[in-house]
A protein has these predicted regions:
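Secretory/extracellular carbohydrate-interaction modules
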Residues: 52-122
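Short, aromatic/His-centered strand-loop micro-motif at the edge of beta-sheets
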Residues: 126-148
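Localized edge beta-strand/strand-to-loop motifs within extracellular or lumenal beta-rich domains
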Residues: 143-159
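Surface-exposed coil/turn segments at beta-strand junctions on protein surfaces, enriched
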Residues: 79, 142-144, 177
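Short beta-strand segments enriched in hydrophobic/aromatic residues
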Residues: 54-58, 90, 153, 188, ...
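Ligand-recognition surfaces built from glycine- and aromatic
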Residues: 174-240
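Low-complexity, Ser/Thr/Pro/Gly-rich disordered linker/stalk regions
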Residues: 1-82, 212-240
């Protein structure tokens, strides 16, 4: 049994801080060392309606939307054993780099997903805490598609699902004491690893229609993860 402990209201300033994150050098607004053209903005039009936007600036960077629970009044953190579910509409423009991920104290990063439209059918799923990763290709993943993603942050294995199907279990997990803040954002690629936006593109977006986190009632009573968290690594995940 589990209970909902977080249901995203992107308009809530108690839940979310807009336009800055300590995952960026000095809290932002730029992170060009990570091949990003982002110039983070707190303008509500870029994130607070659940549509995360980026618009080209005269200086070559892009005003970009980012929300994080870090520094908010509620300060919500996901922790070991939590399960996150989200519904997103993927972007269509080359150079768009949407992501939902976690961060705390210079690390604790797990990428719920990253996506690049130049690899139209591929999702990037990464556990940076213990170095588990998969590149998963699916026919239902494509620019503009609406997909349901789930992640269970298990002690011994982080498990991802797509539209209800398990697609990857990393067999590494996040450990027993892990916790981290949520980040939802749209970055813009600078061209090193994926194409930069085409010259005629001036705006891009993706949509997060739903995001919630559930937690086992009463926590874990033993040192073992529940069975659904400890799925084996083998399965339909495809390494790319």
């Amino acid at each position: 049994m589990s209970a909902v402990v977080f249901s995203a209201d992107f308009s809530s300033e108690r839940q979310w801080v807009a336009g800055r994150s300590w995952a960026y050098p000095d809290g932002g607004p730029t992170n060009q060392g990570d091949n990003k053209l982002d110039h983070l903005t707190a303008d509500s039009a870029y994130s607070r309606l659940g549509t995360f936007r980026a618009r080209r600036r005269a200086d070559g960077l892009w005003d970009a939307g980012l929300l994080t629970t870090e520094g908010s009044a509620e300060g919500f953190m996901v922790r070991t054993g939590d399960h996150l579910e989200t519904t997103v509409r993927l972007p269509t423009e080359l150079g768009a780099w949407p992501a939902i991920w976690t961060w705390r104290d210079g690390g604790n990063e797990v990428d719920v997903f990253e996506y690049h439209p130049d690899n139209p059918d591929l999702l990037e799923l990464t556990n940076h805490v213990r170095r588990g990763q998969s590149y998963v290709r699916r026919e239902g993943v494509r620019p503009g598609a609406v997909i349901d993603l789930g992640v269970t942050f298990g002690r011994r294995s982080v498990v991802w699902t797509l539209d209800g199907e398990r697609i990857f279990a990393d067999g590494r997990g996040v450990g027993s004491g892990w916790q981290a803040y949520l980040i939802v954002n749209l970055s813009v690629c600078a061209g090193r690893y994926h194409p930069a936006p085409e010259p005629e593109t001036v705006e891009m977006s993706y949509e997060v229609r739903r995001l919630l986190v559930t937690r086992p009632l009463g926590g874990y009573l033993t040192d073992d993860d529940p069975p659904e968290v400890d799925w084996p690594v083998h399965g339909p995940a495809e390494e790319g």
